UniProtKB/Swiss-Prot annotation:
Gene3D superfamilies: 3.30.465.10, UDP-N-acetylenolpyruvoylglucosamine reductase, C-terminal domain (3.90.78.10), Uridine Diphospho-n-acetylenolpyruvylglucosamine Reductase, domain 2 (3.30.43.10)
Key words of the record: Cell cycle, Cell division, Cell shape, Cell wall biogenesis/degradation, Cytoplasm, FAD, Flavoprotein, NADP, Oxidoreductase, Peptidoglycan synthesis
Enzyme class: oxidoreductase
EC numbers: 1.3.1.98
Species for this entry: Streptococcus equi subsp. zooepidemicus (strain H70)
Gene Ontology MF: a single term: UDP-N-acetylmuramate dehydrogenase activity
Name under which the protein is recorded: UDP-N-acetylenolpyruvoylglucosamine reductase
Active-site residues, Swiss-Prot/TrEMBL: 167, 217, 287
InterPro entries for the chain: FAD-bd_PCMH (IPR016166), FAD-bd_PCMH-like_sf (IPR036318), FAD-bd_PCMH_sub1 (IPR016167), FAD-bd_PCMH_sub2 (IPR016169), MurB (IPR003170), MurB_C (IPR011601), MurB_C_sf (IPR036635), Oxid_FAD_bind_N (IPR006094)
Keyword Cell cycle: yes
Family affiliation: Belongs to the MurB family.
Pathway: Cell wall biogenesis; peptidoglycan biosynthesis
Length: 295
C-alpha cells in the first residue's frame, strides 16, 4: 500500500488479462481505480513526482496488453462513468460504457449516436480512436473534451483541435488523456432510433464473432479494399497460432479460442500482414494497439 494514496482503490501486481476484452495481458505494478477527478490528480501527481510511469487503460476493447504486463501505474476509469444531458448536448465521463451511453441517447429520443450502439469500449477510448461503424464516427458528433496532460494539467480541446481522421485523433500523438467529452445530438423519432439500433446490432450478431474474446477489428480498412476480404483471399480464415485464430465468421477479427496469449496475437497479426502483402500487394495496418512488455 502507498501511504500517500491511502483511500484510493489501488491493486498491486494485478493481472490485466482479467480486465481486457482479449483476456490476455500480464500484471500491472499498480492498477488504480479513481472515483473522481481529485483521486485521479493525486495518482498522477504522485507518479510524476516520483518519476513512476503511468497510463490510462480505458475499457481495453481495441487493445492487446503484452504478457509481461505494464510497469508503473495503470489507471482505469471504470468508476468515472457519469452521463449527463443538457438539452441536446450529451456529456459523458471517459469511463462511461459506449454502448450504455448510446442507450441514454435512445431513451431521450436523441439521434446521432446510433452507429456506436454495438461498439464495445469506453467514451475515452472511442474519442482517442475516433471509433466508428456503419458510416458513422465520433468525429461527426464530437463537440469538445476535457483532457489530462502528461504533466497532470487539465485542459479543454475543441473538435477542430482534436484533428480527427480515420481511427485517429491528435491525442494519439500528444499523450493527453480524455477525462470527459461532449457530443452534439439532435431530436429524433424514438421508434426510428430503436429500429436503426436494432438493425445495426442484428448485423453485428450475424457478421461478428461476439461469442469469443477478441480485440475487435484488428486492421484499419485499406483504401479501396476491405481487410477481411484480403485475409480471406489469402486463405487465412481459421488460421491459428497457439490459442488465437482468425475468425471463421469474420476474417477481420482474431479470437481467443483456447487460453491464448498476447504473443499468440502478435505472431498471428505479423503472419497475416506478411501473407496478405505477398498475395495482394496490400500492406495491412493494425487498428488494434499493442502495449506493455514482452516476457
Amino acid at each position: 500500500m502507498i501511504a500517500e494514496l491511502e483511500g484510493i482503490d489501488i491493486r498491486e501486481n494485478e493481472a490485466l488479462k482479467h480486465y481486457t476484452y482479449t483476456q490476455v495481458g500480464g500484471p500491472a505494478d499498480f492498477l488504480a481505480f479513481p472515483r473522481n477527478h481529485y483521486e485521479l490528480s493525486r495518482i498522477v501527481d504522485y507518479a510524476n513526482h516520483n518519476h513512476i510511469p503511468w497510463m490510462v487503460l480505458g475499457n481495453a476493447s481495441n487493445l492487446i496488453v503484452r504478457d509481461g504486463g505494464i510497469r508503473g501505474f495503470v489507471i482505469m476509469f471504470d468508476k468515472l462513468n457519469t452521463v449527463r444531458l443538457n438539452g441536446y448536448t450529451l456529456e459523458a465521463e471517459a469511463g462511461a460504457n459506449l454502448i450504455e451511453t448510446t442507450k441514454v441517447a435512445k431513451f431521450h429520443s436523441l439521434t446521432g449516436f446510433e452507429f456506436a450502439c454495438g461498439i464495445p469500449g469506453s467514451i475515452g477510448g472511442a474519442v482517442f480512436m475516433n471509433a466508428g461503424a456503419y458510416g458513422g464516427e465520433i468525429a461527426h458528433i464530437f463537440l469538445s473534451a476535457k483532457v489530462l496532460t502528461p504533466e497532470g494539467k487539465i485542459k479543454k480541446i475543441s473538435a477542430r483541435e482534436m484533428a480527427f481522421g480515420y481511427r485517429h485523433s491528435v491525442i494519439q500523438e500528444t499523450g493527453d488523456i480524455v477525462i470527459s467529452a461532449k457530443f452534439a445530438l439532435k431530436p429524433g423519432n424514438h421508434d426510428s432510433i430503436c429500429q436503426e439500433m436494432n438493425r445495426l446490432n442484428h448485423l453485428r450478431q450475424l457478421k461478428q464473432p461476439l461469442e469469443f474474446p477478441s480485440c475487435g477489428s484488428v486492421f484499419k480498412r485499406p483504401p479501396g479494399h476491405f481487410a477481411g476480404q484480403l485475409i480471406m483471399d489469402a486463405n487465412l480464415k481459421g488460421h491459428r497460432v497457439g490459442g488465437v485464430e482468425v475468425s471463421k465468421k469474420h476474417a477481420g477479427f482474431m479470437i481467443n479460442v483456447a487460453d491464448g496469449s498476447a504473443k499468440d496475437y502478435e505472431e498471428l497479426i505479423a503472419h497475416v500482414i506478411k501473407t496478405v502483402e505477398q498475395t495482394s500487394g496490400v500492406r495491412l495496418e493494425p487498428e488494434v494497439r499493442i502495449i506493455g512488455e514482452s516476457l
